[in-house]
Amino acid sequence: MGQTLFDKVWKKHVLHGKEGEPQLLYIDLHLIHEVTSPQAFEGLRIQNRKLRRPDLTFATLDHNVPTIDIFNIKDEIANKQITTLQQNAKDFGVHIFDMGSDEQGIVHMVGPETGLTQPGKTIVCGDSHTATHGAFGAIAFGIGTSEVEHVFATQTLWQTKPKNLKININGSLPAGVYAKDIILYLINQYGVDFGTGYALEFTGETIKNLSMEARMTICNMAIEAGAKYGLMQPDETTFNYVKGRPYATDFDSSMAWWKELYSDDDAYFDKVIELDVTNLEPQVTWGTNPEMGVSFSNPFPEIKNANDQRAYDYMGLHPGQKAEDIKLGYVFLGSCTNARLSDLIEASHIIKGQQVHPNITAIVVPGSRTVKKEAEALGLDKLFKDAGFEWREPGCSMCLGMNPDQVPEGVHCASTSNRNFEGRQGKGARTHLVSPVMAAAAAINGKFIDVRKVVV
């Protein structure tokens, strides 16, 4: 019997252990940030241990970084975490993409942009959206602080191999419908736990026709489906993206291995989901987890349980309403899900020559300094600012209430991020997950509209 893509990468990295039992995996790349690394570094100090592979460990600052004045950090805890990582990187010989450096940004942007993220690697980070890197054909997953310390000390992790789930996606995406809509629809249809215990492999003609940035959007939200891993077969689109990037120095010698990274025709999948996106609509979440969403033309559903009732109460909405009925106050274009150059370009087409609605506060936060520079070279910063958007410095920003960028209590926000939990964007904030184009259109119109009518 053949092997899946996941099987091939997993098998190559097993150092010890039998199938069906926890196995010791070698870790090729460890990405770290300021929030989940301090205790792990301190653990090394207490045990008088060195960092096993500082050359495979890379740090960036993202979660706590202010996006207005990056060098004026007013929050004491945020400042402490940032300065602690800077000192730890110095003490342990870790390369850091520091504040103001050309490569600094959200960790899941920095890895791909620098060429650190490559097909066939095992990649870990103390962040739940690490599956983003799986878009390259890597096994990438989030880990906790104790596991961060374990990788620091040994460059290995004990893991139990998951089952394989294939999500076969075909059809041409309609105008105004994007990768974000695909993953939101899947979660809405199958729930926030359908991927639990599985590695999700996204396949099909639709996936093959997506850019690398769109592929990353889908893998980014695998965790919102309950899956630790989400990945895609690397192909010419992948190779062309990686080629020439600073840390992709072994590109030519790696190609033979990379071209073997596909699921064999007779590979066994424990479960298969089929999706035709030909008639897919823009998606909007109405509740307090990503499963609580609807296609744009559909009304919000009836209350089925106590969770639905709590979500409606928190969001100030009720069954039967539609997305266009939501009174928006904020729009956030950013996060590791949708703050790449293509996201900003797509959004810019909607707002060109328009003005942000007077009831809306709209901010754009490029996911990295690389994206910011490239966008500014195209004049996107001027376009957004002329329309009334705030143009910020890179960081996680309003994706989570861990920095100064927060949505006021009771206010509805159209957000291109990945989570709409209670309080995720600030105490009492009401988050609606959408694509960048949906968010941009909402900023101009003061409400959600069907972008299929305005995107050509």
Swiss-Prot record:
Coiled-coil residue windows: none
Keyword Ribosomal protein (UniProt): no
Keyword Endoplasmic reticulum: no
EC number: 4.2.1.33
Cofactor(s) required for function per UniProt: [4Fe-4S] cluster
Binding site for [4Fe-4S] cluster: C336, C396, C399
PROSITE patterns: ACONITASE_1, ACONITASE_2
Any single GO BP term: L-leucine biosynthetic process
Free-text remark on how the cofactor is bound: Binds 1 [4Fe-4S] cluster per subunit.
Catalytic activity: (2R,3S)-3-isopropylmalate = (2S)-2-isopropylmalate
EC class: lyase
Pathway: Amino-acid biosynthesis; L-leucine biosynthesis; L-leucine from 3-methyl-2-oxobutanoate: step 2/4
Keyword entries, A-Z: 4Fe-4S, Amino-acid biosynthesis, Branched-chain amino acid biosynthesis, Iron, Iron-sulfur, Leucine biosynthesis, Lyase, Metal-binding
A Pfam family matched in the record: Aconitase
GO MF annotation terms: 3-isopropylmalate dehydratase activity; 4 iron, 4 sulfur cluster binding; metal ion binding
Cited NCBIfam families: leuC, PRK05478.1, PRK12466.1
Subunit annotation: Heterodimer of LeuC and LeuD.
Family: Belongs to the aconitase/IPM isomerase family. LeuC type 1 subfamily.
Stated role: Catalyzes the isomerization between 2-isopropylmalate and 3-isopropylmalate, via the formation of 2-isopropylmaleate.
The name this protein goes by in its record: 3-isopropylmalate dehydratase large subunit
Organism: Staphylococcus epidermidis (strain ATCC 12228 / FDA PCI 1200)
Native organism taxonomy: Bacteria, Bacillati, Bacillota, Bacilli, Bacillales
